[in-house]
């Protein structure tokens, strides 16, 4: 059956949130200091775990096998099994849903605590988490760009979960090329109110019957706007009109024309939407309307996109983390074949075989490395919004912006690979839908595709992120890695630091070649963008893992081998060593390939690619 047995573990989550990242620094900020202590995270994490184990994960079978159904009509065009509403309402009532989007309310939780909550929820059901997560992202745009009056009209019921939210960018003829959108908006006699007409597709949770209304953020163009992305505006378009007092009015001519039949995440409705088929669809312009043909839509939408990109990394981590824990449990139970060191002995559990150990340590170490990258990046988001000084906020914002493409693309690329490793651990049974990794692999593939394909992330990283603010933030990010490698060496990790020194030198060589190609060979720059992005992720993850290793080594020395937590720290040391000595060295292959500068992929005639 599809994944519906919750095996997720929280010990490394708590280690990274409470022991590794400076939780006291976050909790000393004005937004949090009167409301939370470090131990509160344990309670929140444990409540979320129980919801995931007892409510969300058991419903994943129906999510995968039944999913959403399109029945048409203007009221409830997309219906779901009753258990979906139970899951949704449980999450909302526990405060583990779109409430995190409200960054102005007193007593709000630290934002970086949202990362593990979302990870664990995705590990329970990659599809069902979409029911509330997209709403939280939509509220980010609205609370920072709408007038106070319109915020009061829309946001309370979005935060409460009564209404959902969606992001409407993609059209049949405008996918990655967002500037090609054809949806139009036309001014009316009411200031700020525009008529909307057009079609959108691939809209996650664009409709479903668990909420009373869907508030769509729609990219559209004034017919007189400039071509491309410069002319795009963003409008808030409710499925049902929202009156001045916040009550729900008449249908707003937003039609769900169908839902997609997908490889995975069947429990998430991916909708096709038509706006204004009856010439009666209206929306409020977010911010100002186009000025001299230039809209504000892309800048506004990127506030949500940046958040959804790191969240895609979190989704990816949760999905392949669940696959890893399933593989780990299976490997401890499945008896098959004799040990290589005892060929005449009895058959043993497969966890005792060397190659299974390799696959498990690969999954464990990549999971923990990706978690470090994601949690540290969420920590930067928190600091960028809540730190006391402008200097601290700007630094944190810069570091997050540099790492965000890695959070989205590297982690989602690894999710597909690690789910395949989890399948492999299961042997032939891994190919059967009765075992969890099969559905998790189907579910996780979307993460490399949405919120900007991973090649787009690599272009962003090797282009804008290298050069933003005249390249100073990237230089600082790079210098911090170099300083750590140079100054944190210990005898216990001598081999690992030596490996990181070589890898860091190789990465600097990669950066130099990328910079040269910017002016001399733009096609080579494109050919290697994904590999450069992966190299950067391995460098920063190697640094973060070694930092955790230093902490774990100290803890283990302090506690001793007989302590109940000793095995956790021993496992952490093994993860650190495995990642640095087995995953980081893939950088060298990228460096050598770039030196060779092979252009066969470009030079081969299209007719010869057969």
Swiss-Prot record:
Entry annotated with the keyword Oxidoreductase: yes
Active-site positions on this chain: 451 (proton acceptor)
Gene3D superfamilies: 2.40.110.20, Butyryl-CoA Dehydrogenase, subunit A, domain 3 (1.20.140.10)
Record pathway: Lipid metabolism; butanoate metabolism
Listed EC numbers: 1.3.8.1
Keywords recorded for this protein, A-Z: Cytoplasm, FAD, Fatty acid metabolism, Flavoprotein, Lipid metabolism, Oxidoreductase
Catalysed reaction, written as an equation: butanoyl-CoA + oxidized [electron-transfer flavoprotein] + H(+) = (2E)-butenoyl-CoA + reduced [electron-transfer flavoprotein]; a short-chain 2,3-saturated fatty acyl-CoA + oxidized [electron-transfer flavoprotein] + H(+) = a short-chain (2E)-enoyl-CoA + reduced [electron-transfer flavoprotein]
Family matches, as Pfam families: Acyl-CoA_dh_1, Acyl-CoA_dh_C, Acyl-CoA_dh_M
Induction record: Expressed during syntrophic growth with butyrate (at protein level). Seems to be constitutively expressed.
Annotated GO MF terms: short-chain fatty acyl-CoA dehydrogenase activity
Location within or outside the cell: Cytoplasm
Cofactor or coenzyme needed: FAD
Gene Ontology cellular component annotations, sorted alphabetically: cytoplasm
InterPro entries for the chain: Acyl-CoA_dh-like_C_dom, Acyl-CoA_Oxase/DH_mid-dom, AcylCo_DH-like_C, AcylCo_DH/oxidase_C, AcylCoA_DH/oxidase_NM_dom_sf, Diverse_Acyl-CoA_DH
Biological process, per Gene Ontology: butyrate metabolic process
Function: Involved in syntrophic growth of S.wolfei with butyrate, as part of the butyrate oxidation pathway. Catalyzes the oxidation of butanoyl-CoA to crotonyl-CoA. Probably passes the electrons released by this reaction on to electron-transfer flavoproteins (EtfAB) to finally generate hydrogen and/or formate.
Family, similarity comment: Belongs to the acyl-CoA dehydrogenase family.
Record-given protein name: Butyryl-CoA dehydrogenase Swol_2052
Organism: Syntrophomonas wolfei subsp. wolfei (strain DSM 2245B / Goettingen)
């Amino acid at each position: 059956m599809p994944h519906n047995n919750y095996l997720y573990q929280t010990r490394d989550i708590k280690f990274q949130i409470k022991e590794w990242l400076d939780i006291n620094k976050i909790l000393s900020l004005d937004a949090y200091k009167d409301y939370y202590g470090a131990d509160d995270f344990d309670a929140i994490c444990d409540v979320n775990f129980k919801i995931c184990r007892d409510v969300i994960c058991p419903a994943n079978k129906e999510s995968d096998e039944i999913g959403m159904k399109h029945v048409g009509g203007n009221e409830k065009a997309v219906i779901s099994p009753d258990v979906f509403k139970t899951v949704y309402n449980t999450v909302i009532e526990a405060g583990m849903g779109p409430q995190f989007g409200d960054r102005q309310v007193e007593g709000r939780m630290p934002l970086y605590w949202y990362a593990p909550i979302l990870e664990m929820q995705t590990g329970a059901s990659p599809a069902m988490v979409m029911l509330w997560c997209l709403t939280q992202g939509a509220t980010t745009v609205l609370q920072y760009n709408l007038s106070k009056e319109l915020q009061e009209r829309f946001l309370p019921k979005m935060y409460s979960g009564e209404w959902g939210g969606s992001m409407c960018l993609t059209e049949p003829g405008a996918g990655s090329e967002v500037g090609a959108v054809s949806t139009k908006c036309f001014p009316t006699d009411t200031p700020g109110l525009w008529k909307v007409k057009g079609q959108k597709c691939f809209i996650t949770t664009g409709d479903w019957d668990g909420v009373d209304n869907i508030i769509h953020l729609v990219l559209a163009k004034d017919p007189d706007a400039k071509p491309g992305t410069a002319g795009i505006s963003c409008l808030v378009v409710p499925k049902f009109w929202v009156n001045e007092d916040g009550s729900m009015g008449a249908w707003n001519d937003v039609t769900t024309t169908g839902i997609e039949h997908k490889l995975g995440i069947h429990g998430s409705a991916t909708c096709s939407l038509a706006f204004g088929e009856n010439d009666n669809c209206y929306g409020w312009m977010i911010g100002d309307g186009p000025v001299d043909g230039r809209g504000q839509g892309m800048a506004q939408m990127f506030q949500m996109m940046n958040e959804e990109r790191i969240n895609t990394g979190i989704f990816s981590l949760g999905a392949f983390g669940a696959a890893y824990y399933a593989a780990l449990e299976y490997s401890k139970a499945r008896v098959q074949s004799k040990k290589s060191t005892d060929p005449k002995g009895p058959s043993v559990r497969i966890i005792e075989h060397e190659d299974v150990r390799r696959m498990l340590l690969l999954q464990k170490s990549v999971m923990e490395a990706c978690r470090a990258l994601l949690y540290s990046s969420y920590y930067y988001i928190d600091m960028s919004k809540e730190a006391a000084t402008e200097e601290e906020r700007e630094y944190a914002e810069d570091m997050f912006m540099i790492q965000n493409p890695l959070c989205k693309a590297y982690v989602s690329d690894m999710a597909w690979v690690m789910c395949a490793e989890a399948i492999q651990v299961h042997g032939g049974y891994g190919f059967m839908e009765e075992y969890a990794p099969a559905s998790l692999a189907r579910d996780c593939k979307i993460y490399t595709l949405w919120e900007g394909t991973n090649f787009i992330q690599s272009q962003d990283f090797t282009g804008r992120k290298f050069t933003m603010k005249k390249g100073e933030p990237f230089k600082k990010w790079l210098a911090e890695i170099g300083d750590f490698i140079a100054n944190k060496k210990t005898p216990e990790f001598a081999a690992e630091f030596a490996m990181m020194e070589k890898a860091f030198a190789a990465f600097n060589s990669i950066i130099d070649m990328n910079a040269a190609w910017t002016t001399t060979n733009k096609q080579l720059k494109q050919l290697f963008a994904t590999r450069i992005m992966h190299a950067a992720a391995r460098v920063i993850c190697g640094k973060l893992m070694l930092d955790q290793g230093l902490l774990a080594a100290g803890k283990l020395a302090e506690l001793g081998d007989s302590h109940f937590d000793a095995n956790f720290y021993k496992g952490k040391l093994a993860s650190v060593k495995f990642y640095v000595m087995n995953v980081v060295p893939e950088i060298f292959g990228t460096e050598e390939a770039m030196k060779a500068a092979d252009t066969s992929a470009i030079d081969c005639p299209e007719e010869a690619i057969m």
